[in-house]
């Protein structure tokens, strides 16, 4: 049964990856689904999440979870990836289209995705159309979603199930980490530079030729001061801001910066609450309340006795 479960989980991951590769091609290769192929751990000891190696621009991300939950309880982890809906990004082929968003959620040990039969009707609607995948077998409490259309989803809701009560259950506060990205990255997970970049000159010299390539990009030929020629390969969809005969310096931009997206990460805490502690607290509070009531009644009785004695 366990082998069968793993087989279908791996099959689901393969089908989803194949779908993304076919329909999003290189434009999607900086999302968590691809980062997991190159990074065994989603988060370094320093706190840096793997997605930040591909998305070089920093953008905000918001995470909302309950302060505390009971064991074996389903709750929502809501991730907001805000961005300007009017902007368009450059695809791997150079065309312009709307931004996609994706997220990675790193939960404390023991927390996992809630099964479908535990979801409320409201939660089913919020998660409709979203496919959640585990990062890998060594990180069973880390899950990913995306890329999905940012126009369709203004937030990403993860249905989370807290660990069941047991002898080894730790009723403590634990950290929850999240990473969220919008748009394409500047570096592919394999280290290659994407066309969603500002391209700059690698040396001093004069732009001697600018020519188009078959894939929609450009080749900028720079004649250096010592007479050699350097060819700068510019990705498709770039806007050239230099012209032939222009003097350029090393690190001088040759194109505009097309990137409109970015990556952000955040963290918060969630506590696993012991029901027995809560029951004990309620009983203690009830005892204090009753004690206060009896003290007030006793005081009233004492005042009546004093008043009666004064009348005699």
Curated annotation (Swiss-Prot):
Membrane topology is: Single-pass membrane protein
Ranges that cross the membrane: 278-298
Question: Which residues of this UniProt protein bind heme?
Answer: 31, 51, 54-55
Q: Which GO terms describe its molecular function?
A: electron transfer activity; heme binding; iron ion binding
InterPro entries membership: Cyt-f_TM, Cyt_f, Cyt_f_lg_dom, Cyt_f_lg_dom_sf, Rudment_hybrid_motif
Give its localization: Plastid, Chloroplast thylakoid membrane
Tell me the disulfide pairings in this chain.
none
- In Gene Ontology terms, what is a biological process of this protein? photosynthesis
- Pfam families hit by this protein: Apocytochr_F_C, Apocytochr_F_N
Q: How is the cofactor bound?
A: Binds 1 heme group covalently.
Q: Which cofactor does it need?
A: heme
Naming one, the record's GO cellular component terms include: chloroplast thylakoid membrane
Predominant location: plastid
Q: Which residues form the signal peptide?
A: 1-30
The UniProt keyword set, sorted, is: Chloroplast, Electron transport, Heme, Iron, Membrane, Metal-binding, Photosynthesis, Plastid, Signal, Thylakoid, Transmembrane, Transmembrane helix, Transport
Q: What does this protein do?
A: Component of the cytochrome b6-f complex, which mediates electron transfer between photosystem II (PSII) and photosystem I (PSI), cyclic electron flow around PSI, and state transitions.
Q: Would you identify the family this protein belongs to, as annotated? A: Belongs to the cytochrome f family.
What name goes with this protein? Answer: Cytochrome f
Tell me which species this is from.
Bigelowiella natans (Pedinomonas minutissima)
Gene expressing this chain = petA
